[in-house]
């Protein structure tokens, strides 16, 4: 846990310091939306940079957790498509909120992104020329495509830290405690961007708190799929897809505010809580993994441990892995096992 705390402090201080340099040194902020958006993309890679530096200091391999794994499983597909389902549910729930109606319109887009007056009419004409169903389909298609390509690459910069390095540093911690810790760090890490109007342009101060709530809830989902798939790549895909499709909510709702609207508001929080509850039911009563009740290390090691038979023969330890016997001792193959795994077993 000390390693996780060390990383969390360093990544936040480093990221916030870089933001301070860009903000006060180059004037990047709420008044420069293009510059802020560009820096936000760069900002996403600071968790990766911090993790790599600490790994170099600690003499750890790049993929010491084994989670930079591109083996596709069914859970990848679920994590990729789930954001689309959640966004549609979010729109429906948003329509039940006070002062909000379900209506295909451009006004929410104009207000949310503070479109200049001389461009507002053009935005209205462009949206009115597209039927609602076509807008929805195009957003879904482009969002899913971006979610597994450019957005996933950008999200990898964050997820290598949150759902890879921190997971490796918290092997002994149980799922819920780890998810809460990682989500909280992920949320407060965003605070300079939030104060500049990112995600909550009309309520930046309250937005800092709302972002922490969002990150904790979204972090539970992402961590579950990482442990289920034994790969942090699935978190990058899910993160990238959420970023790509969540904007669809502003096309089909009218009214409301930053507290209520979208995946980062109350509507999205309700959807994610319901989704987490469904996963809890599945994990407890249907799945054989029971990830939510285990430590991160046990969840990650289950795929190995289930195939390992250990027997003792005097001073030797025999490990039968996949039908092949490995005998410990000087120069034996077992000595080449991942040191982190051997240490954990000891």
What are these regions (language model features)?
Residues 1-51, 78, 154, 158, ...:
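Transmembrane alpha-helical insertion/packing segments
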Residues 12, 45, 80, 144, ...:
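Residue-level signature of the transmembrane alpha-helical core
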Residues 14-19, 46-50, 82, 86-90, ...:
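Alpha-helical transmembrane segments of multipass membrane proteins
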Residues 18-57, 67, 73-91, 104-129, ...:
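Alpha-helical transmembrane segments in multi-pass membrane proteins
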Residues 54, 138-165, 230-233, 237-243:
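Transmembrane alpha-helical segments in integral membrane proteins
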Residues 78-101, 223-228, 232-235:
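Hydrophobic alpha-helical membrane-insertion segments
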Residues 156-185, 227-231:
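Membrane-interface helix/loop boundary segments of multi-pass membrane proteins
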Residues 204-206, 240-313, 318-322, 331, ...:
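C-terminal membrane module of polytopic membrane proteins
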């Amino acid at each position: 846990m000390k390693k996780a705390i060390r990383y969390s402090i360093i990544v936040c201080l480093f990221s916030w310091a870089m933001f301070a340099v860009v903000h006060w040194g180059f004037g990047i902020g709420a008044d420069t939306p293009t510059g802020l958006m560009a820096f936000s993309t760069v900002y996403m890679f600071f968790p990766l940079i911090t993790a790599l530096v600490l790994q170099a200091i600690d003499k750890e391999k790049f993929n010491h957790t084994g989670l930079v794994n591109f083996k596709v499983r069914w859970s990848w597909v679920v994590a990729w498509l789930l954001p689309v389902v959640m966004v549609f549910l979010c729109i429906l729930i948003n329509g039940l909120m006070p002062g909000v109606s379900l209506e295909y319109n451009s006004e929410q887009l104009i207000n949310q992104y503070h479109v200049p007056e001389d461009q507002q009419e053009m935005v209205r004409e462009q949206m009115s020329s597209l039927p609602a169903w076509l807008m929805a389909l195009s957003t879904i298609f482009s969002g899913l495509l971006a979610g597994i390509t450019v957005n996933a690459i950008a999200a990898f910069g964050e997820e290598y830290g949150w759902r890879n390095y921190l997971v490796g540093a918290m092997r002994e911690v149980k799922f819920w405690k780890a998810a809460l810790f990682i989500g909280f760090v992920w949320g407060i890490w965003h605070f300079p961007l939030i104060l500049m109007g990112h995600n909550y342009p009309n309520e930046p101060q309250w937005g800092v708190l709302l972002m922490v709530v969002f990150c904790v809830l979204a972090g539970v989902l992402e961590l579950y799929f990482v442990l289920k798939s034994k790969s942090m790549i699935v978190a990058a895909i899910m993160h990238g897809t959420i970023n790509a499709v969540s904007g669809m909510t502003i096309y089909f709702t009218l009214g409301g505010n930053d507290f209520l609207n979208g995946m980062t508001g109350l509507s999205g929080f309700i959807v994610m809580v319901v989704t987490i509850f469904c996963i809890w039911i599945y994990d407890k009563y249907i799945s054989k993994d029971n990830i939510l009740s285990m430590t991160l290390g046990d969840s990650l090691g289950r795929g190995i441990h289930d195939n390992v038979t250990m027997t003792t023969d005097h001073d030797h330890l025999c490990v039968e892995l996949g039908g092949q016997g490995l005998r410990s001792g000087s120069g034996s193959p077992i000595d080449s096992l991942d040191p982190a795994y051997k240490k954990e077993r000891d």
